[in-house]
Amino acid sequence: MAPTMIATLSSPVGLAQADFQLAGPMKDRRIVVAMSGGVDSSVVAALAARSGAEVIGVTLQLYDHGAKAKRVGACCAGQDIRDARAVADRLGFVHHVHDHESRFRDTVIDQFADEYLAGRTPIPCVRCNMGVKFTDLFQLARELGADCLATGHYVRRVMGPDGAEMHRAVDPARDQSYFLFATTQEQLDFLRFPLGGLEKNVVREIARDLGLGVAGKPDSQDICFVPDGDYASLVRKLRPEAEDQGDIVHVDGTVLGAHKGLIHYTVGQRRGIDIGGQAEPLYVVRLNAATKQVIVGPRRALAVSGARLGDANWLADVEGRDVLAKVRSMAKPVPARVTANRLRFLSPEYGVAPGQAAVLYDAADKSRVLGGGWIEETFTAE
């Protein structure tokens, strides 16, 4: 059944650009596909099946089947698991579901709350990719005897002179390289990202041509375990002390008022400070978890010359190298240099928040991902 349906596919350009980079006859290859129940991973599974390889779909159940699971466009919960199973049944391959709720809660959700408690701005999607998705799925795929693990992430795996390299996706609006900086070289050697060379509209066209029920399913939005976007409510439930009040203090030392909890603030924020009578707009400059203070100041006080990176992961030698640094998921990469895990911007940057990641790209080949690290500390520009 599966070969007949896939043969009717009318997206030759998209198919030509989807490559699993496996040597030898595909009929002798086994591909494990990480399936979230969305259109992207479903199309990856379809392309894998079309290649002639043996396909095994795997879905990790990451949180409960309660109210969160009812939201359309979520990830790895009730309806999403059923959607993944339906795709596997339609295309004719085996599908496994593994319960990873406890690990997801311990390594992603609890860590998310702890970061806010520490006055940092977390990125749970990176933590999830680092642990539950890539580390756990990597091990599972190995145990299943797979030749590779394929995912629906929009990033490219390119073979360079020294082995596999990570590059940005062709579709800049969909590029997810910022969230994948912690992928190790060992993982990159085993991973495949067949959608990295495709645009999203082509992916949806492939899904429609296959008659997949997820073809029109909305993309995942916000943080998957915060379905209504109210992250403060979740953190408050897990860590009630996160809403302890404290002082709002100007960078000159003047106490301006009181705040309702550090979880409501992040570096660079302007709205929500609610301090009137100031000569110029105020921004959150830093958060002091020890004293429960929100430090504010004019925009010029946000300028930083660099940052210290922790838990860095490098896919190439970056020491003393000219790089482009991206310090927020939606930020434009800016020129910088790295020395001993200390990032120095060639021009001051604004709104650089501890807890976020600094992801580095090759200054010459602007698409290549060199790795990155977590922003532990920033240095005020003189």
UniProtKB/Swiss-Prot annotation:
Enzyme Commission designation: 2.8.1.13
Stretch list, region Interaction with tRNA: 174-176
Disulfide bonds: 128-224
GO terms of molecular function: ATP binding; tRNA binding; tRNA-uridine 2-sulfurtransferase activity
Any one of the GO BP annotations: tRNA wobble position uridine thiolation
Annotated positions binding ATP: 34-41, 60, 152
Protein name: tRNA-specific 2-thiouridylase MnmA
